[in-house]
Amino acid sequence: MAVKGLGKPDQVYDGSKIRVGIIHARWNRVIIDALVKGAIERMASLGVEENNIIIETVPGSYELPWGTKRFVDRQAKLGKPLDVVIPIGVLIKGSTMHFEYISDSTTHALMNLQEKVDMPVIFGLLTCMTEEQALARAGIDEAHSMHNHGEDWGAAAVEMAVKFGKNAF
């Protein structure tokens, strides 16, 4: 029996009244696309309407924190504020220290961003040692050895927006 992974939610959350932003990097696009698709499908199953899922891109994972902040601000300025945002990126270790620097700085920046934007920022950054690990965590490896983590991020987005979003209190 596996003990890892997201546990079952304490209830089913209705996402029909929330607006979700997804901002994703373009590096490792096959994996990114699968993760985004998983998040969208899971949110749709929880009632989030397709027209309330807004998608934006940035070049790479390092650009996610700044891009996310600007994305959130722009939606608010347009009078269509988001309730939650999911930055999605995939980092795969190579032979240099690049992986460590980008993983660490991006993780901390995304964590700190929640206070700046005053909304839940779901951690959608895969940090994998190999391409095979990334494919597995996107649910697209040949053996289908794992589920798509994008589904977890979509479920977390709905739960956090409903429980703790601006309209929750």
Curated annotation (Swiss-Prot):
Annotated positions binding (2S)-2-hydroxy-3-oxobutyl phosphate: S95, T96, R137
InterPro entries with a match to the protein in the record: LS (IPR034964), LS/RS (IPR002180), LS/RS_sf (IPR036467)
The species this protein was found in: Saccharomyces cerevisiae (strain ATCC 204508 / S288c)
Something else known: Present with 3260 molecules/cell in log phase SD medium.
Gene3D superfamilies referenced in this protein's UniProt entry, alphabetically: Lumazine/riboflavin synthase (3.40.50.960)
The protein's enzyme class: transferase
GO biological process: riboflavin biosynthetic process
Reaction it catalyzes: (2S)-2-hydroxy-3-oxobutyl phosphate + 5-amino-6-(D-ribitylamino)uracil = 6,7-dimethyl-8-(1-D-ribityl)lumazine + phosphate + 2 H2O + H(+)
Top-rank taxon, per record: Eukaryota
SUPFAM superfamilies membership: Lumazine synthase (SSF52121)
Keyword Mitochondrion: yes
Location in the cell: Mitochondrion intermembrane space
Pfam families linked: DMRL_synthase (PF00885)
Record: residues binding 5-amino-6-(D-ribitylamino)uracil: W27, S61, Y62, E63, V90, L91, I92, F123
Its biological purpose: Catalyzes the formation of 6,7-dimethyl-8-ribityllumazine by condensation of 5-amino-6-(D-ribitylamino)uracil with 3,4-dihydroxy-2-butanone 4-phosphate. This is the penultimate step in the biosynthesis of riboflavin.
Molecular-function GO term, any one: 6,7-dimethyl-8-ribityllumazine synthase activity
Designated name of the protein: 6,7-dimethyl-8-ribityllumazine synthase
PANTHER family reported in the protein's UniProt record: 6,7-DIMETHYL-8-RIBITYLLUMAZINE SYNTHASE, 6,7-DIMETHYL-8-RIBITYLLUMAZINE SYNTHASE DMRL SYNTHASE LUMAZINE SYNTHASE
UniProt EC number: 2.5.1.78
Family note: Belongs to the DMRL synthase family.
Annotated pathway: Cofactor biosynthesis; riboflavin biosynthesis; riboflavin from 2-hydroxy-3-oxobutyl phosphate and 5-amino-6-(D-ribitylamino)uracil: step 1/2
Keywords on record: Mitochondrion, Riboflavin biosynthesis, Transferase
